[in-house]
Amino acid sequence: MQDTAKYLVHADITADGVVERSDVVGAVFGQTEGLLGDELDLRELQDASKVGRIDVEIDSENGQSFGRITIATSLDRVETAILGGALETIDRVGPCRSAIEVRKIEDVRSAKRREVVERAKSLLDGAFDESMRSSRDLVEEVRESVRVEDITDYEGLPAGPAVADSDAIVVVEGRADVLTLLQYGIKNAVAVEGTNVPEAVASLTETRTVTAFLDNDRGGELIRKELGQVGDIDYVATPPDGKCVEDLARHEVMSALREKVPYGRFKQAASDDADPEAAEQRTGEAAGATAADSEPAATDGIGGVTTDAEGKPVSSPESPAESPAADETAAVSAGTTPADAEEAAVDGATKTSTAGEEPNTPDDELTATSEAAEPGSAETKGESTAAEAPESSADGPAAAGASTDEQPKTLRGHVSDVIEAETGTFRLLDAEFAPLAAGDAGDVFEAVADAETVPAAVVVDGEASQRLLDIAAQRGIDHVVAASTGEFVKRPTSVRVRTATQLLNPEKA
């Protein structure tokens, strides 16, 4: 009956005396018999399984009894309510007066519905965690599988598929960083996986253009410092503050790589941040040098030649504001062509950039020496100073005869000695175009790679190959002059490459 019951009738009973359970059951059947007719008689309803067992719980205390009566029924709501009203007509249980009050009629189906709701909640919370997945999860899983398939190993380290063949690589911290870059189409990344830089990565950086793309935390700083000691870093890229490389969006990755800076400049900026007093001192020294150079000198009025306090001719430095038109005018007045004046300015230039500066230095930023700026100064006074010797040796026959054993002091002079003379050799020159090393043209690559002092220029009586240009760019060389040039797959922007013809005879080039 409990399985088919629709309603439960809950009633409270009190009696003025001590009664037993059997007394209560007998009173229920006896006092309701014939009260509601045959169709609603309790015995008939029990026989028809429309009313279940009558449950009675009774207790006695201080000469009184009290308890609860529960009757299960499958009748409809109206008949159940009539049955509840009939129970309240019972006024005696055994020899004692009593009172019965129906407390509530419970809908069993409602109780079952509550159980169903509670169970459904628990199932919804736990049963679907593993089986139900959103479309975003599915897309991410497929994308991750593709990225994992693309990642390869380089000497046991996570790397993109293009690391082995690419002439430029991106060094990152871990496997997750490589996966992030792969997702955005960057396939030449290799991970060091820890603060101890592997020898494979250190060796790889010596022959490739290297960009260190590491986090801005302590670990990234240590890796960058060690990589700069055991390997060769060309550029440094950093993620936005507070973010790791593996968490960057596509536009953040591309922006960081576009805004990479040369390693030397990055180190200088880092040292300035660590020691602001030294940076301020360097700034003051530079300002003082500029002020000293800008002091006006006296003019003797003869041919516009500038003289110092002792009356000796001095050449004024070229003004930064001079335009190409002014250069051409000066060249014509000195009896030379504009092209010759431009080449003389390049030959007498002083190397101002270091290995850590921005490689894309325009040619017009090379500052010509005072001798190239005023070739007629010595002729006007009839005397020549030691500082004017480089230009005089290239253009003045008298100066050339004075010391035939001296090395040329200009790039043109070295090109004439090495390439025009068809010596089959090379020369490495410093910033003042003084020779650092020389040898057979076939050994120029090894000489550049092993040079203790980084040369400013290379003059070789042979072909300027892609291999030579790559090592020149890595070492920070500004000029390469060769007898001929080969086919270049990638021409470095930091190295100015010319043939001897282009330098000595630009009108024939």
Curated annotation (Swiss-Prot):
Family annotation (Pfam families): Toprim_4
CDD domains hit by this protein: TOPRIM_primases
Database matches in SMART domains: TOPRIM
Residues the entry annotates as binding Mg(2+) 2: 215, 217
PROSITE patterns: TOPRIM
Catalytic activity: ssDNA + n NTP = ssDNA/pppN(pN)n-1 hybrid + (n-1) diphosphate
Single Gene Ontology MF annotation: poly(A) binding
UniProt EC number: 2.7.7.101
Keyword Nucleotidyltransferase attributed: yes
Stretch list, region Disordered: 267-411
Co-factor binding details: Binds two Mg(2+) per subunit.
First-tier enzyme category under EC: transferase
Domain of life where this protein originates: Archaea
Domain annotation Toprim: ranges: 167-253
GO cellular component: cytoplasm; DNA-directed RNA polymerase complex; exosome (RNase complex); primosome complex
Feature: compositional bias, Low complexity: 313-331, 383-402
Keyword line: DNA replication, DNA-directed RNA polymerase, Magnesium, Metal-binding, Nucleotidyltransferase, Primosome, Transcription, Transferase
Assembly information from the UniProt record: Forms a ternary complex with MCM helicase and DNA.
Recorded family membership: Belongs to the archaeal DnaG primase family.
Protein name, per record: DNA primase DnaG
Organism of derivation: Natronomonas pharaonis (strain ATCC 35678 / DSM 2160 / CIP 103997 / JCM 8858 / NBRC 14720 / NCIMB 2260 / Gabara)
